[in-house]
């Protein structure tokens, strides 16, 4: 990995998104440049490229919309903060409170994913029902054709 800050085009290329998309994600608050050049140009670290890749994964591979992506990223950011706080904390009661908050966040994310899975399952069932109707209709049309030809 490179320690040199990346320009916007380099970061976009590494994450396989367009510069316009990267800027749009910034406008939405999903991503922030790690630094700016003296001239004000955006500069990105490898962590920023990893976040861009995570946004793409959530959006393109898992089918999350941008509001859902924001929810996941916010939760993941908070979980990262909690992880650091846990390891910096010596007090067991404070650690317990940190873990309880992490569990609550994780539970909310699981519920959101479950709701999405249920919506997808419903959509899949609708598509299967349509396929069954189309198949039955096609079979009926073939039977009619065969009856008139034969």
Show where each model-derived region lies.
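Short glycine/proline-centered loop/turn elements that form peptide/ligand docking sites
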Residues: 11, 18-21, 40
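The alpha-helix within a helix-turn-helix
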Residues: 12, 26
């Amino acid at each position: 990995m490179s320690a040199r800050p990346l320009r916007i085009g380099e970061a976009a290329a590494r994450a396989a998104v367009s510069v316009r998309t990267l800027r749009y994600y910034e406008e939405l608050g999903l991503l922030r440049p790690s630094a700016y050049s003296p001239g004000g140009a955006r500069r990105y670290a490898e962590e920023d490229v990893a976040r861009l890749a995570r946004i793409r994964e959530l959006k393109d591979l898992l089918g999350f919309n941008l509001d859902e992506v924001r929810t996941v990223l916010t939760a993941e950011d908070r979980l990262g903060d909690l992880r650091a706080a846990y390891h910096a904390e010596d007090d067991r009661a404070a650690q317990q409170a940190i873990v309880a908050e992490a569990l609550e966040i994780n539970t909310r994310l699981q519920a959101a994913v479950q709701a999405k899975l249920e919506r997808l399952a419903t959509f899949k069932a609708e598509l299967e029902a349509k396929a069954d109707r189309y198949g039955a209709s096609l079979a009926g049309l073939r039977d009619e054709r065969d009856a008139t030809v034969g």
